[in-house]
């Protein structure tokens, strides 16, 4: 019986832990699969995906900077992908790609089940308005937060995300210059790539954003998350959480879409956490 082919597309993507995660899920569930990493620059993505499909590809994950391009290539995106305008999971069906976004479900599951956070009634600051932010924002709203403030270097992108979410009473955009005037938040989510340069000054955020309950969450992990988590600890946030748990949980959601069974995530998370020193970024 031929082994089904899966892959993660990104640029760069050689560092991705997704092949190892899905290999572990396959062993755990007894499902034989071939999962590889495929580097594709944005201008090469469409052709690379077509070649993958022609070679028998059944499903794919998509990471930076291709999530919005994957949405455009999806014949029938899911509701949550449509709201996000970004796709991180592709399923091949009847010769077409169906797009979904499991990032938000992965984040919420990690925060609520692994870390025991209750998101209901919380005020959230979302840093960033790109594909990563778009992927998690709808799920945070569904989890019961009361207000989301979106801040992005490009105000136009923040406005576009708020418009796409369609909840003007709960979601607003603000300028970076206004951070000192926004009050405090129970959840601060970094959905930017600012930490990739490992610049300790990249997150010189006002301490007034923090209260006694604040959880600071970086959607990246490992070296990429160091700068933001260092700020979170210096600001005395109650929780400083990286994106490793989200990575594993969103991968399990993707695996379930492809194979009809959701694997156990704690063993994989624990094994990866033990390898913490070699982790690079959340994809």
UniProtKB/Swiss-Prot annotation:
Binding site for shikimate: 16-18, 63, 88, 103
Keyword Ribonucleoprotein attached: no
Superkingdom of the source species: Bacteria
Entry's Gene Ontology BP terms: amino acid biosynthetic process; aromatic amino acid family biosynthetic process; chorismate biosynthetic process; shikimate metabolic process
Binding site for NADP(+): 79, 128-132, 223, 243
Disulfide-bonded cysteines: none
Residue numbers annotated as active site: 67
Entry's EC annotation: 1.1.1.25
Catalytic reaction(s) noted: shikimate + NADP(+) = 3-dehydroshikimate + NADPH + H(+)
GO CC term (a single one): cytosol
The protein's enzyme class: oxidoreductase
Gene Ontology molecular function: NADP binding; shikimate 3-dehydrogenase (NADP+) activity
Alphabetized UniProt keyword annotations: Amino-acid biosynthesis, Aromatic amino acid biosynthesis, NADP, Oxidoreductase
Keyword NADP: yes
Pathway assigned to this chain's UniProt record: Metabolic intermediate biosynthesis; chorismate biosynthesis; chorismate from D-erythrose 4-phosphate and phosphoenolpyruvate: step 4/7
Binding partners and assembly: Homodimer.
Function noted in UniProt: Involved in the biosynthesis of the chorismate, which leads to the biosynthesis of aromatic amino acids. Catalyzes the reversible NADPH linked reduction of 3-dehydroshikimate (DHSA) to yield shikimate (SA).
NCBIfam families, per the entry: aroE, PRK00258.1-2
Family: Belongs to the shikimate dehydrogenase family.
Protein name: Shikimate dehydrogenase (NADP(+))
